[in-house]
Amino acid sequence: MSYDQLPERLRKTCLALLLAMISPLHADLAANPSFLDERFVTLDDWQPMTFPNIKRHSTYSIHPCGDKTCLLMESDNSASGLLWEKTFNVYEYSFLKWRWKVSNVYRQGDSATKEGDDYPARLYVLFNYDPEKASAPKRIKYELAKLLHGQFPPDSSISYIWDNRETTKPFIVNAYASEARMIPVSSGSAQVDTWQEYSVNMLQDYKMAFGQDPPPLASLAIMCDSDNTQESAKAMVDYIRIGSVP
């Protein structure tokens, strides 16, 4: 028997039960449109993110910004980042907004090469790996990575970057990893040392860069690096927000 063939009273009862099941989710999202509102008063919720064989690390500190504080990121022939370890559902909280500025871009920076893969500022969205949904070759690859590093690497990532060179490309495949796609939100030196604000839809950007839907769970990381170019830069981050509305 189809839904349309049910008695009217029973159809109304089914509809009421369905609405009762989904309304708490909608009410929760409406009451909590913002999952993260990071104003960088402290770095208590952020953990260092370092890389094997890179001994010189970038530095991250809370810095005065007028009547408030910001995150100061400094890199001098170095690389490391900050990881926000909490996870969120990107289908429930699809919108990412932030404000930053950089002191300069890198003369030797080139997103097409490993030697030029440095950026004065980048904001990562790291999507969790799910072994139950992975192909057999991918499971083997990720199990080996877990043996080496103690945990699974991200399934994939998108990173919003300040590209060193002027570009109109909607996204760039990272020179080190095809699972990492970079989206230039600013490029070149025309706007250095000025605050730039961005608002993006992570779901749409992932689909644009990968041609498919993303895994549901993700976390954030932020970085200023210069180990490949051996140059230096500073960047400041005013805030980062994740929410269910733009």
What is each of the regions a protein language model found here?
Residues D44-K68:
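Extracellular glycan-recognition surfaces and repeat-rich motifs
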Residues S61-G81:
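Short carbohydrate-recognition loop motifs
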Residues E85-L96, S189-V192:
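Extracellular/lumenal carbohydrate-interaction signature centered on repeated Trp-anchored short motifs
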Residues D28-N53, A136-P137, K141-Y142:
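Extracellular carbohydrate-recognition regions
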Residues D118, N128-Y176:
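Extracellular/luminal beta-rich ligand-recognition
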Residues L220, I240-I242:
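Extracellular beta-strand elements of beta-rich domains used
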Residues Y3-C14:
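Bacterial N-terminal signal peptides that target proteins for export
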